[in-house]
Structures are given as structure tokens and as C-alpha cells.
């Protein structure tokens, strides 16, 4: 029964129970509102906004300052090598503080050893299966575009970010939960709803500090989050039971969907786990990050439309020689460079490597990180002209040219691919906790971009509206941005 139901009940004023509940609800709501105002972070307590205006991006300072706010430290990139694998600076404690992983509904991120390890193991295992995943990802992309972008050869508009969220939700569902759910609108809406409500809930809850264990029961975003989990259970468990019955007594085959693969690992090890929370965690991680990347790279390509023709030519030439294979994706060097350059200028956030000091830590130059302090690292090297000439300028060929330089000098260019990580490019993190799903995400984005570029002409409706923006440490493209698209009439001559 909701508060509204209680207030509108015919027995509200005659029965003591609903009257008491109603009065308590009103009182508690007022108290929480007052405490939220009292606990609202001041400007001094808020994380500093890192410069993002292109004119201020070029960070040439040799020693950027250490910034502090509240119980947190923002460390310059020069500490990357010390921070990345220091076990006294806890990655998991940082996750728990940032993402409030003990709150019901948010626990999909952090539910016991198996749940944490299996998500990383799944990402690693499926990264080794990319060659087998190309066909289903390509097929699913084609289906999505035909149904949502249409075959219309006249210009028509689509919401850029929303379209990318639905696309990535469908592609990842194909690999994570299989054919049965990847086009199921209920599952897609639940995955997207969980993603959106999770972000909203975390942002709201952080305003309440020590009141979080109470407040989360009443916030609409938290209640919506828990509803997503409840509604997802019959879908996930129904498909999983079908898979189990289908394969009962059969010789085990290698699974191409994460749902069956994880269930198989759990069965072999005798571990009990929550399939629904595991799938929602996978869906959130993939949709939130990869749809953001797709939104940014499509906007960047539209802003630099001189790249469209050479990108199409590269895709056609590579696929004609190598077919739709993992080797073909690796040979698309310009596409890879455009992705990496987009991520260099517009990473998901301007801070990374969030850690909590389990003990006091002294860095090599004497800088002290006190016990309990949350340390984050800036991504300022990505915007430094001493490392990337004319760092504030988007250059789609930047990493192609750097590869050519390495080839000419006999140096290794392994650190220049989209999925590689280094202290100078931390779009996927750095060190042993770098994103394990980046290889899958890289293949997924390339396949989707190949379909889009070869099949459609596209342009931004409003370039100014679609420009890069910041919200605290987050960097994003305006969700109101619209694309104009039309189906190309050219005979591409390539089979997907």
C-alpha cells in the first residue's frame, strides 16, 4: 500500500493504524527534506570541476597541484604508476564508497566474492571469444538499424544518445542473455531503467551521508531500482531454467551467452549465486559506458565529416581482404584511431583510479595519503601537449600517425590501439583493475560503426547543442542531441 492509498482510504480517519502510518510518513518526509538541505554539499566540499573548454584543455604545467575536498584527494597523473597496483589503496573500497554497493538495489555491483570475480572472469573469457561473437553482434546491429533507423532514403531525425543506449542494450543482451531476451522489449527497458535509476539513486544518496541506510527506502529512484530487480527476476530465471532443461543430460558445449556460461561455472564450483543481479551488473557496465562512447564518437565523426569517406574506404578495403573477422577489426586502424582520439578528449570522467587508503600511504615524493582518505587520479596527461601535440585539437589520424612513427623507428606500437591502457591514456583505467571488458567493447563499437557508416548518411541537427559538457567529474554529450540520418542508396557490395 502506498502513502497515497493510505490517505485516500475510506478508513483513514477512523482506523488508528493507517492514520499513524500516514502521520509518520509525512513527518519523516519533512525531516528527510530538512536534513537533505542541511547535508547538501557546499562548494568547498564538492569536487573541483576539471577544465573542459577546448581553449583550457591544454595542460602544460609540469607539476599540476594536488587538490583536496572533504576527505578526498585528487592526485595528478604523475602518480599513476604508484597508485595503479598499490594494494594499500583499495579498489573495492573505492567502488563501495562511490557506488554505495551495500544499499539494496545497488548491490548488483558488489555481492560476494563469486559475483565480483565472475563478472571479471566473464569479461575476460568473452574477450577471448571475439572471433565467435562478430557474427551475432553484426546480425543484431543490422536488425536494430533496420527496425529503428529504417530503410528510408529521405532525411529523418533520431535521438542520438537514446538510440545508442537501445542499440548497445540489444547488442550486449545478445551476448549476455542470448537470443531469447535480446529483442525482448521488457528486458531492454529493464536494463535501461536499471542503468538510469542506478545513476540517479547514487547521485541523490550521496547528499545524505550517514542517513543513507534510512533514506534509500524512501527515495523514488531507489524504489524504482529495486522494482527493476524484482521485475527482471522472472525473465532471467525463466530463460535460465529453459537452458538448464534443454541441456540436461547432454554433453556440455561451450556457451556463447554469458548467462549459460556463468551458470556452468557456478555449477562446476558448487557456488550459489544470484543470476539476476549478475546480469543487471553486466548490463549496467556495458550500456552505461559503451553507449556513452558510441554517442561521443558519432558526434565527433559528424563534427569532422571529412573522416567519413576515408573511414568507409578503410572498412570496405579491409573487409574485402579479411572478411568479417577479428583480424579485420584489428586492421581498421583509422577507425581505431578515431575511437581512441574521441576517448582521449572525452573520457567518461576527468578523474579515474578511485581508491581508499586502508593504511596511511607515503608516495615516493613524500606525499602522504592518510588512512581512510579517498584518492583519485586526474587524466590530465591525455590533454597535455607535451605528450600529444596540439592536445586540445581533435585529430582523427593522431594514433595512425603515431603508429607510423613507431614503425619508422622500429618501436612497438602496441600501446596505441583503442583498447590499450597507459599512464598517458587512461580511458579504460590503468593497472590490474583496468576495464576487463574493453576488448569486447572495442569489437562491439567497431562492428556497430561499420554498419552505421556503410549504410547511412548522418549529420548532427544542432552541433552546438551536441557539444561536450561536464557535470562534476563526468564528461558527456547532451542527451537532447539529435541526428539526421538517411539510408544510403549506394551498393556497398559487402555481406554482413
From Swiss-Prot:
Chevalone E derivatives produced by this cluster are interesting candidates for cancer therapy since they synergistically enhance the cytotoxicity of doxorubicin (DOX) in both MDA-MB-231 and MCF-7 breast cancer cell lines. The keyword Oxidoreductase applies. Pathway: Secondary metabolite biosynthesis; terpenoid biosynthesis. It is a single-pass membrane protein. Pfam families: p450. The keyword Heme applies. Heme binds at residue 435. Cytochrome P450 monooxygenase; part of the cluster A that mediates the biosynthesis of chevalone E and its oxidized derivatives that possess a unique five-membered lactone ring and can synergistically enhance the cytotoxicity of doxorubicin (DOX) in breast cancer cells. This is Cytochrome P450 monooxygenase cle4. It comes from Aspergillus versicolor. The gene is cle4.
Amino acid at each position: 500500500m502506498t502513502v497515497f492509498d493510505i490517505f485516500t482510504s475510506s478508513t483513514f480517519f477512523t482506523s488508528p493504524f493507517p492514520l499513524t502510518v500516514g502521520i509518520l510518513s509525512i513527518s519523516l518526509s519533512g525531516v528527510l527534506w530538512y536534513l537533505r538541505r542541511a547535508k547538501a554539499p557546499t562548494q568547498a566540499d564538492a569536487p573541483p570541476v576539471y577544465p573542459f573548454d577546448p581553449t583550457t584543455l591544454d595542460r602544460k604545467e609540469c607539476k599540476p597541484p594536488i587538490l583536496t575536498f572533504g576527505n578526498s584527494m585528487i592526485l595528478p597523473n604523475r602518480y599513476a604508476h604508484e597508485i595503479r597496483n598499490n594494494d594499500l589503496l583499495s579498489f573495492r573500497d573505492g567502488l563501495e564508497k562511490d557506488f554505495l554497493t551495500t544499499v539494496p538495489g545497488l548491490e548488483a555491483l558488489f555481492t560476494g566474492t563469486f559475483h565480483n570475480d565472475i563478472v571479471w572472469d566473464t569479461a575476460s573469457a568473452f574477450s577471448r571469444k571475439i572471433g565467435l561473437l562478430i557474427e551475432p553482434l553484426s546480425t543484431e546491429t543490422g536488425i536494430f538499424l533496420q527496425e529503428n533507423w529504417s530503410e528510408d532514403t529521405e532525411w529523418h531525425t533520431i535521438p542520438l544518445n537514446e538510440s545508442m543506449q537501445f542499440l548497445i542494450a540489444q547488442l550486449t543482451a545478445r551476448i549476455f542473455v542470448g537470443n531469447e531476451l535480446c529483442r525482448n522489449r521488457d528486458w531492454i527497458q529493464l536494463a535501461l531503467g536499471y542503468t538510469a535509476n542506478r545513476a540517479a539513486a547514487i547521485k541523490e544518496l550521496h547528499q545524505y551521508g550517514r542517513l543513507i541506510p534510512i533514506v534509500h527506502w524512501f527515495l523514488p529512484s531507489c524504489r524504482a531500482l529495486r522494482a527493476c530487480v524484482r521485475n527482471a527476476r522472472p525473465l532471467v530465471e525463466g530463460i535460465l531454467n529453459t537452458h538448464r532443461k534443454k541441456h540436461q543430460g547432454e554433453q556440455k558445449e561451450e556457451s556463447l551467452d554469458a548467462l549459460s556460461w556463468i551458470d556452468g561455472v557456478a555449477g562446476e564450483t558448487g557456488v550459489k549465486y544470484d543470476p539476476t543481479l549478475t546480469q543487471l551488473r553486466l548490463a549496467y557496465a556495458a550500456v552505461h559506458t559503451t553507449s556513452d562512447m558510441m554517442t561521443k564518437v558519432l558526434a565527433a565523426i559528424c563534427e569532422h565529416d571529412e573522416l567519413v569517406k576515408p573511414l568507409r574506404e578503410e572498412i570496405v578495403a579491409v573487409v574485402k581482404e579479411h572478411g568479417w573477422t577479428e583480424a579485420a577489426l584489428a586492421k581498421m586502424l583509422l577507425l581505431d584511431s578515431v575511437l581512441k582520439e574521441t576517448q582521449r578528449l572525452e573520457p567518461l570522467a576527468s578523474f579515474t583510479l578511485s581508491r581508499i587508503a586502508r593504511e596511511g600511504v607515503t608516495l615516493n615524493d613524500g606525499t602522504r595519503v592518510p588512512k581512510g582518505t579517498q584518492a583519485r587520479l586526474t587524466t590530465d596527461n591525455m590533454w597535455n601537449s607535451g605528450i600529444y601535440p596540439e592536445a586540445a585539437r581533435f585529430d582523427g589520424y593522431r594514433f595512425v600517425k603515431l603508429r607510423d612513427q613507431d614503425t619508422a623507428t622500429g618501436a612497438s606500437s602496441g600501446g596505441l590501439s583503442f583498447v590499450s591502457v597507459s599512464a598517458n591514456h587512461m580511458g579504460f583505467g590503468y593497472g590490474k583493475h583496468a576495464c576487463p571488458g574493453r576488448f569486447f567493447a572495442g569489437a562491439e563499437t567497431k562492428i556497430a560503426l561499420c554498419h552505421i557508416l556503410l549504410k547511412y548518411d548522418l549529420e548532427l541537427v544542432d552541433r552546438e547543442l551536441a557539444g561536450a559538457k561536464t557535470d562534476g567529474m563526468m564528461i558527456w554529450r547532451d542527451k537532447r542531441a539529435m541526428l539526421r540520418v538517411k539510408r544510403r542508396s549506394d551498393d556497398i557490395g559487402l555481406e554482413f
